[in-house]
Regions:
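Short, conserved "switch-loop" micro-motifs in signal-transduction and mechanochemical regulators
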Residues: 85-86
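Active-site beta3 strand of CheY-like receiver
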Residues: 47-53
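C-terminal output helix
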Residues: 89, 107-116
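Acidic catalytic/metal-coordinating carboxylates
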Residues: 36-39, 62-65
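Two-component/phosphorelay signaling modules centered on CheY-like receiver
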Residues: 13-32
Length: 123
């Protein structure tokens, strides 16, 4: 596939690996990684990836804070929440801050594929 950059932000190394493996099966393999919300913000500003997957509960800055700052920097940023935990309030706040979608962990490859197709269809 085309060489699009995808940022994966999760404090769990295993979760990042699982998401990368699922995305690779969809034909994409150019990844940036972050282990907390602040790293996600910094990485986004430096590399401007086309798609961001972010967990909600993380150290330093959580996913909601990361989404807010990323979207403040780039209102067109395409951010997807991927989380197994998080309160309804946190999920609502993530959507209000500009998250485009939510995927529940554990996720299926088809769910990841649907998100990626929706993002890049027609490019």
């Amino acid at each position: 596939m085309e060489n699009v950059k995808i940022l994966i932000c999760d404090d769990s190394i295993l979760a990042r690996k699982q998401l990368k493996d699922a995305i690779k099966k969809c034909g994409y393999d150019n990844f940036l990684e972050a282990s907390n919300g602040q790293e996600a913000i910094d990485t986004y500003k430096e590399h401007k990836p086309e798609l961001v997957f972010v967990d909600i509960v993380m150290p330093i800055k959580d996913g909601v804070e990361a989404i807010h700052e990323i979207r403040e920097f780039d209102p067109t940023a395409h951010v997807i929440v991927v989380s197994s935990v998080g309160t309804q309030t946190q999920l609502k706040n993530a959507i209000m801050e500009g998250a485009r979608d939510f995927i529940q962990k554990p996720f299926s490859i088809s769910a990841i594929n649907d998100i990626i197709r929706a993002r890049f269809e027609g490019r």
